[in-house]
Curated annotation (Swiss-Prot):
The gene is argF. It comes from the Archaea. This is Ornithine carbamoyltransferase. GO terms for biological process: arginine biosynthetic process via ornithine; citrulline biosynthetic process; L-arginine biosynthetic process. InterPro entries: Asp/Orn_carbamoyltranf_P-bd (IPR006132), Asp/Orn_carbamoylTrfase (IPR006130), Asp/Orn_carbamoylTrfase_sf (IPR036901), Asp_carbamoyltransf_Asp/Orn-bd (IPR006131), Orn/put_carbamltrans (IPR002292), OTCase_ArgI (IPR024904). It is an enzyme of class 2 (transferase). Its main location: cytoplasm.
């Protein structure tokens, strides 16, 4: 029994296997193939402390396509909202379900859930990591760039957030060059140190830069909202600090015509990205969103096999 709290815990070949399974699931889905449910009658619990569109619905769809039922719940709907401990809650859920996908404010909550669980715990987003998003990002880049290894991608904006961190981690596992483009006060140099062993094995490279011109020649330009959930009190300061890092048509021109545009969504149009980019010919955000479903199927299949 394994968990998916962060891709840091996975070896490069394991990440690649999950992505190959994702591509296979997608190929069969697009071909209209109706395949025998892998886990008929099983239950997956979606425990969400935060709102969600793509993560909640992609996990629900993925579970259904594998023959499982997903039940969505929040702290206010469980006794955990009235003081029952996480440990006791997880011991009970372990008797009913085969997995719990949890979206939480603090990554430590996920760790406590996993420590007290006899079923798989999946990170559906925490303040530090978003591994499900990173897997969908990798599948999308693979599809459009035509290769899985050696990809060059620039994440522009809040380079300290969970999406940027998980992109860097999966990039290190797959031998990518990940350019984290944002203000110096958001640089997390410890992340590069933590990934040094994987980078040495795969030949990847991760570096921080505050120059928007460093998007030149990449395969993909990626951004995310400037004010993530939980940082609303810092909204104005973050907008001021990140305004020079808006992904607009000029940035895409620097990147080059072959570069694709990625965004994990939801987008705050007019802030981190302009309409002409997200709706433009280089944007692949809707395919990227669909890929959340296919990679979720692969994660379920990999963990529950």
């Amino acid at each position: 029994m394994r968990h998916l709290l962060t891709l840091m815990e996975y070896k490069p070949h394991e990440v690649e296997n999950i992505l190959r399974m994702s591509r296979d699931f997608k190929t069969r889905y697009l071909a209209g193939e109706v395949y025998t449910p892998i886990f008929p009658g099983r239950l997956v619990v979606l425990y969400f402390e935060k709102p969600s569109t793509r993560t909640r619905l992609s996990l629900t769809a993925a579970a259904a396509q594998l023959g499982m039922q997903a039940v969505y719940t929040t702290p206010s709907e469980l006794q955990i909202g009235r003081g029952e401990t996480i440990a006791d809650t997880m011991r009970v859920l372990s008797r009913y379900a085969v997995a719990v996908a949890a979206r939480v404010y603090r990554h430590e909550t996920l760790e406590e859930m996993a420590q007290n669980s006899s079923i798989s715990v999946i990170n559906a987003l925490s303040d530090k990591h978003h591994p499900l998003q990173a897997l969908a990002d990798a599948l999308t880049l693979w599809e459009y760039v035509g290769k899985l290894h050696g990809i060059k991608v620039a994440f522009v904006g809040d380079v300290s957030n969970n999406v940027a961190t998980s992109l860097a981690i999966i990039g290190a596992k797959l031998g990518w060059e990940v350019r984290l483009v944002g203000p110096k006060q958001l640089w997390n140099m410890k992340l590069v140190e933590e990934l040094s062993e994987d980078l040495a094995k795969t030949g990847g490279r991760i570096y921080f830069t505050d120059s928007i011109n460093d998007v030149a020649g990449v395969d993909g330009v990626y951004t995310d909202v400037w004010v993530s959930m939980g940082f609303e009190k810092e909204a104005e300061e973050r907008r001021r600090m990140l305004k020079p890092y808006q992904v607009n048509q000029r940035v895409m021109e620097i990147a080059g015509r072959k570069a694709i545009f990625l965004h994990c969504l939801p987008a705050h149009r007019g802030e981190e990205v302009t309409d002409d980019v997200i709706d433009g010919p280089q944007s692949v955000v809707w395919d990227q969103a669909e890929n959340r479903m296919h990679t979720a199927k692969a994660v379920f299949a990999y963990l529950l096999r």
